[in-house]
Structures are given as structure tokens and as C-alpha cells.
Regions:
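Conserved catalytic-core motifs of GNAT/GCN5-like acyltransferases
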Residues: 2-3, 114-116, 129, 134-151, ...
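Conserved SAM-binding loop
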Residues: 16, 117
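Flexible coil/turn residues that form the inter-helical turn or adjacent wing/linker of helix-turn-helix
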Residues: 37, 111, 149
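Active-site phosphate/pyrophosphate-handling residues
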Residues: 96, 126, 154
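Short glycine/proline-centered loop/turn elements that form peptide/ligand docking sites
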Residues: 98, 121-124, 141-147
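Short amphipathic helical patch at the helix-1/turn junction of helix-turn-helix
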Residues: 84, 118-119
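Acetyl-CoA-dependent GNAT
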Residues: 2-12, 18-91, 95-108, 157-161
């Protein structure tokens, strides 16, 4: 009986894998829940079908709970988006997904990875700094703010080679 309760309340481990067109609706829904302007299913599908785009997902109990997506160009990649469902944040899932994704990008020949992040998104900035990203530029007034004052985008870079 104790084994039953242990299994029932145990924290499930996420399953990390490449994302594909089958994940379009779930990625679009998670993106919409995570960002002020979410991607439509058509936008997500277009990205997932693009041969220069790499995407990974995290499934928790069979449900998509996080994703990361990048576009490759020559020997560089740009992380287009990272999202983790609110209920799954704070447990290291984004770190695991980011590390897997960076290894795969390196395996595909990317020597440097770039991304943009809202200057007020401290959790994401902390994640990226811990993963070895460093600020290389700042775009003032880039992100619209609900309070009327736009936020800067920090441009971060990490060398893979």
C-alpha cells in the first residue's frame, strides 16, 4: 500500500525529445499562455516544417509542458522561443531542455547561439546566464509593456565551439 501512495505522489520525470508537426496545437497553446502575443497554429506549423528550425519538447505525464525552438543559419543559431507551463516552472525543466537543445545545435554545426530576452524577465536571464550566455547588445523600447513603458530586449550570445 505504501508503494501505491509513493508512486501516486512521486514527481514524474519529463520526457525530452524533438518536437514535430504533431505538436503544433500544444506548442501554440503554450506559447499563447506564456507571451503577450502568442504564435498562431499556422505560425507554429510553418516553423516546425522549416528545415532550418530545430525544436524540442518536454512531455510530463504525456502532456506537452515545455518547448524550445531555434532557427539555424550557417554556423549560428537563434533561439526563437522557450516556454514552460506555469505549473512546471521552478523545477529545472527549462535548464534540462536548454542543455539538450544546445548540444543538438552544436551537433548540427552551430558555433554560436543568440537570443533576445525582456530585460524584466529575471528568471529567464538567470537561466541563460547560468547556461553561459552573455549580453552582447541591448535594444531599447523593444517589448511592449502592459503598463505603457516598453522594455528593452537584451541580446545574449553563447559560443558553442
Amino acid at each position: 500500500m505504501i508503494g501505491f501512495f509513493t508512486q501516486l505522489f512521486a514527481r514524474a520525470e519529463p520526457v525530452l525529445s524533438e518536437a514535430g508537426a504533431r505538436d503544433t496545437a500544444a506548442i501554440a497553446a503554450l506559447h499563447a499562455a506564456s507571451f503577450r502575443r502568442g504564435w498562431s497554429e499556422q505560425e507554429v506549423e510553418g516553423l516546425l516544417l522549416d528545415r532550418q528550425v530545430l525544436a524540442h519538447r518536454a512531455l510530463l505525464r504525456g502532456k506537452l509542458t515545455a518547448f524550445i525552438m531555434s532557427r539555424l543559419a550557417a554556423d549560428e543559431a537563434e533561439i526563437l522561443s522557450v516556454a514552460v507551463a506555469a505549473r512546471s516552472q521552478g523545477h529545472g525543466l527549462a535548464r534540462k531542455l536548454l542543455n539538450l537543445h544546445l548540444r543538438r545545435l552544436a551537433g548540427l554545426g552551430a558555433r554560436a547561439v543568440f537570443l533576445e530576452v525582456d530585460e524584466h524577465n529575471t528568471a529567464a536571464i538567470r537561466l541563460y546566464n547560468r547556461a553561459g550566455f552573455r549580453e552582447v547588445a541591448r535594444r531599447p523600447n523593444y517589448y511592449p509593456d502592459a503598463g505603457g513603458k516598453p522594455a528593452a530586449a537584451l541580446v545574449l550570445r553563447r559560443d558553442l565551439a
